[in-house]
Amino acid sequence: GTVKGVMPRSLQEMGAQIVALNPDGVRSLGMIIGRRASEIAAIDFYGRVLTRRETVYAYPTPDRVMTFARDSLPRMLDELGFEQVRRIAGIGVSAPFQLWNWLGSVNAPAGEMNAWRGFDIPAAVAEMSGLDVVFQNDVTSACTAEHLYGRGREFDDYAYFFIGSFIGGGLVLNGTVYPGRTGNAGAF
């Protein structure tokens, strides 16, 4: 199950019920579509990486990214085995919004990057994987990871800054990642 009993004998004798998340109860997959690389990882309920695959490219195209996913996913699932695969809840996908606007930043031909226009990333990943998909802006996803697993756990309200090829931001308000109406509230 998703929870397991974890209580000292003294509390058991008092009839207390203390439970914790069972790290083996649920598995999920995460996919990152980046400017120079893509990655797929399988994680447990605590966020620990169980297996992962990565590909590097000069610039992303829908064909490159989806071919990588189609080639990687079956091998990852084989590594996990039936017991773990049956516990997969879904796949989270993160990517920068409007990838077709990166022409200059990734030195890609216009025709290649325009292939992202109208390409429905969540629908393509759902069709390819057969899993439920949650799609989020890449920096909002990074903010979420910091909030769940990093120093962000210590604060209820903060601005998150990601500095890489570009500078992006995320917001945490009242202990919750705030994506905003458009999914990238922290963008600037």
Language-model-derived ranges and their functions:
Residues G1-P23:
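N-terminal helix-turn-helix DNA-binding module of bacterial transcription factors
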Residues R9-L11, L21, G30, E83, ...:
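Generic marker of residues within folded, mature protein domains
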Residues G15-T51, Y160-V177:
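Gly/Thr-rich phosphate-binding beta-strand-loop-beta motif of the actin/hexokinase/Hsp70
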Residues R36, A89, G186:
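Residue-level signal for beta-strand positions within conserved beta-sheet cores that form or flank
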Residues D44, P122-A123, G186-F188:
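Acidic-glycine-rich active-site phosphate/pyrophosphate-binding loop
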Residues G47, L103-S105, G175, G183:
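Detector for glycine-centered tight turns/loop "hinges" at secondary-structure junctions
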Residues V49, R53-D157:
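Glycine-rich phosphate-binding loop and adjoining helix at the ATP-binding site
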Residues V139-F188:
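Acidic, glycine-rich loop-and-beta core segments that form the ion-binding/anion-interacting portion
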